[in-house]
Swiss-Prot record:
This is Enolase. Its main location: cytoplasm. GO terms for biological process: glycolytic process. The lineage of its organism: Bacteria, Bacillati, Actinomycetota, Actinomycetes, Micrococcales. It comes from the Bacteria.
Length: 426
């Protein structure tokens, strides 16, 4: 039995140049686990609290020294001596120590950093890769990458309302092949943008961020890039969206493409998109508090396309249960820092899968070189992963880890492919 011997935390930088928390856990057998915590740009109002210092004279108020201190001064003494493999008890001890419903005392960034570092240390102690330690012998499904190759919304400085335009290589036989297809489309998209005199500057997640006249124009450009790369839209590579509609929901209406639209008008717009394009997934199509609109949309097109709750569910099992009970949405986006502990994350995934909801393991726009989510994706057989464009090392690190996992699994590896999107009839 390996016990927790020491826990240390430090302030490091994420991919946006903002501070974040990194934690190291030392076990009694000498093994060390490390984890770094991501941070989002478009955040749901029901997410667990990310503790920031608020000192404008240091990192413009975005320092995380309070969270670091919480790890060192409060969490570390409380967890010393715990069996590192008892993840649920460790996470519960931190929740009890925090004592708030949203982790507002210690900070979700402090709790999550420790939670993930413990898992990494325990896996090392067991001499197992993290995906196998968490998922056991049945962890073998490699996810379809939802690759964010064109950015709008709060991830880019442009007139495009939708935050992420993604490609999904559903026709590939293996993860490595799917990744290659995505990379080829990404580079072809750059060529298309250059030919049209459009910007090839990058957004937060590595996707291009040109100033386009409409959201449909973005989809058309991507389809052109898919064809130029030698692939067939809908057969080889499908499209997916993250609308992040809470970002443009103001005064009871959706401020979209220069108009103030109702939920029913937005739903009609999405129905047209699903009819006109090979769309397999739409994330956060409506505001996180517009449950009535979400239900109507699910009833209307939920049998044709994956409707993903990100801000709607914030990886929270209690909120997800409401969605399941009311048959609202049909997919869960899984972000470890939304809920703030590994145990709660795995509980949410398990609940979703039992209810027939698809699951997508996801990064945040502020990322680090930490690859834990790649292992979580395989551990849970999630079937899909969002971790940005095939550019910028903090994104590519996750793809490279999945390549390693696929190689290690060898003949046991199965690529989710088209089966990850059971509602898509394209």
């Amino acid at each position: 039995m390996a016990l927790i011997d020491a826990i240390h935390a430090r302030e490091i930088l994420d991919s946006r140049g903002n501070p974040t928390v990194e934690v190291e856990v030392l076990l009694s057998d000498g093994q060390i686990g490390r984890a770094a915590v991501p941070s989002g740009a478009s955040t749901g109002e029901h997410e667990a609290v990310e503790l920031r210092d608020g000192d404008k004279g240091r990192y413009l108020g975005k320092g995380v020294q309070k969270a670091v201190d919480a790890v060192i001064d409060q969490i570390a003494p409380a967890l010393t001596g715990f069996d590192a493999t008892d993840q649920r008890s460790i996470d519960q001890a931190m929740l009890d120590l925090d004592g708030t419903p949203n982790k507002g005392k210690l900070g979700a960034n402090a709790i999550l950093g420790v939670s993930l570092a413990v898992a990494n240390a325990a896996a090392a102690s067991a001499d197992l890769p993290l995906y196998k330690y968490l998922g056991g012998p049945n962890a073998h499904v490699l996810p379809v990458p939802l690759m964010n190759i064109l950015n709008g919304g709060s991830h880019a400085d442009s007139d495009v309302d939708i935050q992420e335009f993604m490609i999904a290589p559903i026709g590939a036989e293996t993860f490595s092949e799917g990744l290659r297809w995505g990379v080829e489309v990404y580079h072809n998209l750059k060529s298309v943008l250059k030919e049209q005199g459009l910007s090839t500057g990058l957004g937060d997640e590595g996707g291009f961020a040109p100033n386009l006249p409409s959201n449909r124009a973005a989809l058309d450009l991507i389809q052109e890039a898919i064809k130029n790369a030698g692939y067939t839209p809908g057969k080889d590579i499908a499209l997916a969206l993250d609308v992040a509609s809470s970002e443009f929901f103001k005064d009871g209406a959706y401020q979209f493409e220069g108009k103030a639209l109702s939920a029913s008008e937005m739903s009609a717009y999405y129905a047209e998109l699903v009819a006109d394009y090979p769309l397999v997934s739409i994330e956060d199509p409506l505001d996180e508090n517009d449950w009535e609109g979400w239900k109507t949309l699910t009833d209307a097109i939920g049998d044709k396309v994956q409707l993903v709750g990100d801000d709607l569910f914030v990886t929270n099992p209690a909120i997800l249960q409401r969605g399941i009970d009311t048959r609202t949405a049909n997919s869960l986006l899984v972000k470890v820092n939304q809920i703030g502990s590994l145990t709660e994350t795995l509980d949410a995934v398990s609940l979703a899968q039992r209810a027939g909801y698809t699951t997508i393991t996801s990064h945040r726009s502020g990322e680090t070189e930490d690859t834990t989510i790649a292992d979580i994706s395989v551990a849970t057989n999630a079937g899909q992963i969002k971790t940005g464009a095939p550019a910028r090392s903090e994104r590519v690190a996750k793809y490279n880890q999945l390549l390693r996992i696929e190689e290690e699994l060898d003949d046991a590896a199965r690529y989710a492919g088209r089966s990850a999107f059971p509602r898509f009839k394209g």
